[in-house]
Amino acid sequence: MRLLASVLLALFAVSHAEEGARLLASKSLLNRYAVEGRDLTLQYNIYNVGSSAALDVELSDDSFPPEDFGIVSGMLNVKWDRIAPASNVSHTVVLRPLKAGYFNFTSATVTYLAQEDGPVVIGFTSAPGQGGILAQREFDRRFSPHFLDWAAFGVMTLPSIGIPLLLWYSSKRKYDTPKSKKN
C-alpha cells in the first residue's frame, strides 16, 4: 500500500512540475519525389501538449538557401501570438528546387515562451533527413508513359509478326480452295 501511495505521489509531483506550454513540432515533405523545377510541398505541424498557452511562437527554417530553392508560396519564418493548450497549428510552404542532386533536409527552429514571464524556450522540428532531388529529364525518363517508345516498338515488331502471318495466309488460301466437282 505504501508503494502504491509513493508511486501516485511521484506521478502527481511530476505532473505539477511540468506546468506551462510544451510544444512538439514536426517537419515533413508531402511530395513522394522531389524534382528539379517542380513544386515541393513542406508541412510544419506544431502541437501544444502542455497545460497552458504557448506565447510568441516563432517558426524559422533557414535550411533552404535561395540559390538552391525558390519560394512559390508561404513563408519560411512564421509567428503566432499564442497556441492554446491541447491544440495545434499547421503551416505549409511550397518551394521549387532549382538544382538536382542530394540535399540534407534539416530541422527548423521553434522558439516560444512557456509562461508569460518565463525564459524563451528553443526547440527543433523533426528532420526529414537527406533526400535526392531528381533532374527533370531523369524524372520524365522514369515515370512518363513512354507512348512514343511503345509506338516505335510496335512498328518494329510488325515485320516479325506480319511476314509469317502473310506466308501462312497465302499457304492456307492455296491449299484450302475448294475443288470443283466433276460430273
Curated annotation (Swiss-Prot):
Function: TRAP proteins are part of a complex whose function is to bind calcium to the ER membrane and thereby regulate the retention of ER resident proteins.
Glycosylation sites: 88, 104
Gene that produces this protein: SSR2
Protein family: Belongs to the TRAP-beta family.
GO cellular component term, pick one: endoplasmic reticulum membrane
Signal peptide coordinates: 1-17
Keywords: Endoplasmic reticulum, Glycoprotein, Membrane, Signal, Transmembrane, Transmembrane helix
Biological processes annotated in GO: in utero embryonic development
PANTHER family, per the entry: TRANSLOCON-ASSOCIATED PROTEIN SUBUNIT BETA (PTHR12861:SF3), TRANSLOCON-ASSOCIATED PROTEIN, BETA SUBUNIT PRECURSOR TRAP-BETA SIGNAL SEQUENCE RECEPTOR BETA SUBUNIT (PTHR12861)
Pfam families, alphabetized: TRAP_beta
Annotated localization: Endoplasmic reticulum membrane
Segments in the Lumenal topological domain: 18-149
RNA-binding is among the record's keywords: no
TM helices/strands, residue ranges: 150-169
Predominant location category: endoplasmic reticulum
Name recorded for this polypeptide: Translocon-associated protein subunit beta
Organism from which the protein derives: Canis lupus familiaris
Cytoplasmic side: 170-183
Bilayer disposition of the protein: Single-pass type I membrane protein
Subunit structure: Heterotetramer of TRAP-alpha, TRAP-beta, TRAP-delta and TRAP-gamma. Interacts with STING1.
